[in-house]
């Protein structure tokens, strides 16, 4: 039985190319064209009567015969075989060096080269020293040892490769050359060489810009980790393994070529490297406290308060907010829409806030000199009336709100009151007839006495209230008529105060020049009055 095969050099290629279906040859050739055509490189197939067997044999012959050869070419181009060979040799050396407790080698390895066999010609593996001595050093481009006349190698070499010189020593008296086991001249791939050269050029330019900082940092990290790899950068000769090939010197660029920002970055990197090296060289470990998730927030707050970092953080946040608020787009419009600085409407249960928080708000704004914003809350006459009824019979201790304000007494006359105040005062009684009757009844008892104006200044700057009161000593809750609307020094619209003022603690007036500070407890109905067409306003002091 004759077989016609195309010898590609690889055994796997030959087995893949050979078909399992072999047609029986006739005893006599009827025609000269039916003779075996081994030289033509194809397998003749006789016509078969079975269609299924013919289709199956065609599928088997359709298999690509150069798949394994291309895979081997890939392994040689990527230096995978070289790496595997190195690993195997190192493992062999370690096994050969291992010894038992008695000092006997664990594995007895005899080199067939040194001790040849007398029965047959020795074609064994050379010694490890010989392999290391004759192995070529790694170059920029991986070589392709064409130990077999592969079709894939010859086809690819014909149009994309150039011939290179011999690698290593290939003398006839050497072990590799004499036995014919040495590698043939490799064929370097032109595209791969150009790719590696471009990459090396980028590394060279990057090394020039960073002024060896990258090499120092990498060498420092590798040294700290105890690694002795050959791929790490060195301080003495950065990129020296290809600088000679490219014709560039590894000299550092002068400082004049670098900008101020680059010099500062280089200085910071060098400083960081020194600090890291000093920390790694410490013989003792770091004395750090144990981490506790329950105590950590408190420790952080204590640390911030101890080093006074809260004001610094506040300044940083304020600067960031200022920059963002003043940022503008290309068309001139602000990046963020700036709203009015008024405090938004608080819910109706805002009186449940703690008095300390309410008292601290005007004090902080007064210290910073910011204008006080108008505090407007939702108001319901029914709820205020219920609260006032409940508070009348309760002792003074039930009152929760307390603050300090100044009273300034200024002698005024009813005739000197501006017309706007009377106009504003006429609107409120018309809207509430019951409150008007109460106001008239309360003022009849004090109409014979001369009137003085109580100049009430709230803790927040910019708000002044003038209240008409009677001369003498005021005791208990007394209702008074407003003489003028509140005087505002702000541009925001501010609703008028109601004409009733309930003071829960007695106080005495003083001469007009004095400003005594009086502590007063005001109920929830203090300064509450719905205004016609203006909404409502509730202010708790």
Curated annotation (Swiss-Prot):
Keyword Phosphoprotein: yes
Compositionally skewed regions (Basic residues) per UniProt: 383-392
Protein's name in the database: Coiled-coil domain-containing protein 116
Highest taxon listed in the record's lineage: Eukaryota
Organism name: Mus musculus (Mouse)
Coiled coil (UniProt feature): 79-102
Sites bearing Phosphoserine, chain numbering: 394
Entry keyword set: Coiled coil, Cytoplasm, Cytoskeleton, Phosphoprotein
Major subcellular location class: cytoplasm
Polar residues bias (residue ranges): 351-363
